[in-house]
């Protein structure tokens, strides 16, 4: 194993942003030696990402099209006093699909399974190796969030198998008919097949604390309200996402160093 790796582009962080950058470069600049550095076993982690058809320009659709696991031509929203079906396409990507696509496109030699210990003009890895690249992109996540005034979007989602089927024919992107706990709250449902549905309890709050067990119980209660009998929980993911409302943005960007940022 060489002590120094040389390449054209080094991407620190194999989440959604880092994975998409790697895929895009491999497609449009295949002559470049691109390395993706990620210490965890799976590119993209454990996530389901969703987007509306209108979120991505037609000319950029080629990048995400192979990653789409589920597509629906419309979706529902529900509030205490009204509900609607909106005629816009909706899509979901499972992180396992991103992982497989990145590994197939880059090949095993260009994915560096190591922890980044320092990033600057070059990347230092925790195992003692260094990466010297013409371009370095830091896609490992946020810098010093204390520079910003933040709220938080918090969620827990579970992929459920429902005995006898769930009866949904399209996503419920926002069901705000539920009890409002600790801030604005809604339930999100993605019907993957007749018996499988991803249910996520999402809410906005002033606190980053996530009460995992409470959210699990809320999903159970929501399933019971719909008359669903949960046969199995096939996956679970959680998230606490910062929502910037103000602060010192110049200090925030400086806190992350001078390397190009993504994600």
PLM regions: where:
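Predominantly flavin-linked oxidoreductase catalytic cores and closely associated redox partners
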Residues: 24, 109-233, 247-251
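Short beta-strand to alpha-helix junction loop
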Residues: 84-104, 139-140, 206-214
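Short acidic-glycine loop/turn motifs at beta-strand connectors
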Residues: 78-83, 192-195
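Structural motif
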Residues: 8-9, 135, 258
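FAD-binding beta-loop-beta segment adjacent to the flavin cofactor pocket
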Residues: 181-184, 239-261
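N-terminal FAD cofactor-binding segment of flavoenzymes
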Residues: 24-28, 32-81, 97
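N-terminal Rossmann-like FAD-binding beta1-loop-alpha1 element of flavoenzymes
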Residues: 2-36
């Amino acid at each position: 194993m060489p002590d120094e790796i040389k390449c054209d582009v080094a991407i620190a962080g194999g989440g959604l942003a880092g994975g998409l950058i790697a895929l895009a470069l491999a497609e449009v600049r295949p002559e470049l030696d691109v390395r993706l550095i990620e210490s965890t076993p799976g590119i993209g982690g454990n996530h389901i990402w969703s987007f509306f058809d209108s979120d991505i320009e037609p000319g950029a659709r080629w990048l995400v099209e192979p990653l789409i696991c589920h597509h629906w031509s419309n979706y529902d929203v529900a509030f205490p006093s009204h509900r609607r079906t909106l005629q816009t396409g909706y899509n979901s990507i499972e992180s396992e699909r991103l992982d497989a696509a990145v590994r197939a496109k880059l090949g095993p030699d260009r994915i560096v399974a190591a922890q980044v210990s320092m990033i600057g003009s070059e990347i230092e890895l925790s195992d003692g190796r260094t990466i010297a690249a013409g371009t370095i992109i830091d896609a490992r996540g946020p810098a010093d969030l204390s520079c910003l005034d933040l709220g938080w979007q918090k969620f827990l989602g579970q992929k459920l198998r429902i005995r006898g089927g769930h009866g949904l024919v399209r996503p419920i992107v926002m069901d705000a008919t539920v009890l409002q706990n600790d801030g604005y709250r809604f339930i999100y449902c993605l019907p993957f097949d007749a018996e499988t549905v991803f249910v996520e309890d999402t809410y906005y709050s002033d606190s980053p604390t996530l009460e995992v067990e409470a959210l699990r119980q809320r999903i159970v209660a929501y399933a019971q309200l719909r008359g669903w009998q949960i046969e199995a929980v096939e996956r679970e993911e959680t998230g606490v996402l910062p929502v910037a409302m103000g602060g010192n943005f110049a200090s925030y960007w400086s806190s992350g160093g001078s390397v190009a940022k993504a994600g």
